[in-house]
């Protein structure tokens, strides 16, 4: 009987510990440590709020698919994804309205009026290059350069049918080559040509593969390239292609019927706080609130003249045509 009592007590203590741990947890889909320096942000969230957020390496599309699959019994509390996926999540009714502190300082076009999604930062798409892995080849300066045979097997872009940055790549290339959101023929033609150059097409962030030299050239955002160059001290260059590119926001949402809603709200409050926005700025992301980027960080960006080649698009329209583009890409390219 005494042994049984000790065993029961141990089980109860373990259960209480698990409950306590759960009480201090918020599950975030798509918070990978090697992307946008989420690793530092999550440590700051834990230190400031006491809420632990486990790392998660899904991409935007995988996160939305998981939310839809779990709609009847949600697992996640918050989700981070590209703006078009935020719009789709709202349409699928898998996210709830929440307006964090600092909400009023988010520009009107970068948040849902009811709080179902809101931007937290933005970045500009371009070409991230591990110069040492090029074997003496010049750093490509244009989308056209990536089609050259000398770069065969060296170029990577994330899957446009799943990852937001992949879809952004398609939209940017399409726009740069004369297409628009009603006509993706230029992008499809480009990816068909690039396919002959043996590209690498991962679904998740390939940051570490660029740093190792396994993937010398990656279509990616400025913030990842600057982090590689100035924080990880890699010989990495970032190029905004001569034909042009686009800048896009990333957004977050509170999951509908989140199991740890209060903790999820704390996470969302923090990423929009002065401290959270300052961390994004230090990670080379452009904060969505008017938080000053450190002078030394701003000085490491490409000149404004280069950024003049990056435009913006209608994100609502971009979301509306995303599914059709993905289907066409899978049918005609992949």
How would you label these PLM feature ranges?
Residues 83-90, 211, 216-235:
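A ligand-binding cleft/hinge motif common to bilobed small-molecule-binding domains
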Residues 95-104, 117-118, 144-147, 217, ...:
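Short beta-strand->loop
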Residues 23-88:
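Early extracytoplasmic/lumenal segment of secretory-pathway proteins
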Residues 126-133, 171-175, 248-261, 271, ...:
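A bilobed periplasmic-binding-protein/Venus flytrap-type ligand-binding module shared by bacterial periplasmic
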Residues 297-334:
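Extracellular/periplasmic bilobal clamshell ligand-binding domains
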Residues 105, 123, 188-193, 199-200, ...:
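Periplasmic-binding protein-like
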Residues 31-39, 75-214:
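Extracytoplasmic ligand-binding site segments that recognize negatively charged/polar headgroups
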């Amino acid at each position: 009987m005494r042994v049984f009592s000790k065993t029961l007590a141990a089980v109860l203590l373990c259960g209480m510990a698990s409950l306590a741990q759960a009480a201090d947890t918020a599950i975030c889909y798509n918070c990978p440590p090697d992307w946008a320096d989420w690793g530092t942000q999550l440590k700051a969230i834990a230190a400031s709020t006491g809420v632990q957020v486990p790392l998660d390496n899904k991409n935007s599309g995988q996160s939305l698919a998981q939310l839809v699959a779990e709609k009847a019994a949600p697992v996640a509390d918050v989700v981070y994804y590209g703006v078009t996926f935020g719009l789709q999540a709202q349409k699928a009714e898998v996210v709830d309205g929440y307006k964090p502190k600092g909400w009023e300082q988010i520009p009107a076009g970068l948040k849902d009026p009811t709080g179902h999604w809101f931007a937290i930062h933005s970045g500009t798409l371009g070409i991230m290059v591990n110069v040492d892995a090029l074997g003496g080849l010049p750093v490509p300066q244009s989308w056209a350069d990536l089609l050259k045979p000398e770069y065969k097997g060296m170029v990577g872009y994330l899957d446009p049918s799943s990852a937001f940055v992949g879809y952004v790549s398609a939209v940017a290339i399409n726009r740069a080559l004369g297409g628009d959101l009603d006509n993706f023929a230029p992008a499809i033609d480009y990816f068909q040509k690039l396919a002959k150059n043996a590209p690498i097409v991962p679904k998740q962030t390939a940051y570490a593969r660029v740093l190792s030299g396994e993937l010398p050239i990656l279509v990616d955002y400025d913030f990842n390239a600057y982090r590689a160059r100035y924080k990880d001290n890699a010989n990495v260059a970032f190029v905004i292609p001569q034909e042009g590119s686009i800048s896009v926001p990333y957004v977050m949402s509170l999951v509908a019927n989140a199991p740890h809603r209060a903790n999820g709200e704390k996470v969302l409050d923090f990423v929009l706080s002065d401290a959270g926005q300052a961390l994004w700025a230090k990670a080379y992301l452009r904060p969505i609130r008017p938080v000053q980027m450190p002078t030394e960080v701003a000085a490491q960006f490409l000149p404004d003249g280069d950024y003049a080649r990056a435009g913006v698009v209608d994100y609502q329209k971009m979301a509306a045509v995303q599914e059709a583009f993905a289907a066409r890409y899978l049918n005609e390219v992949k």
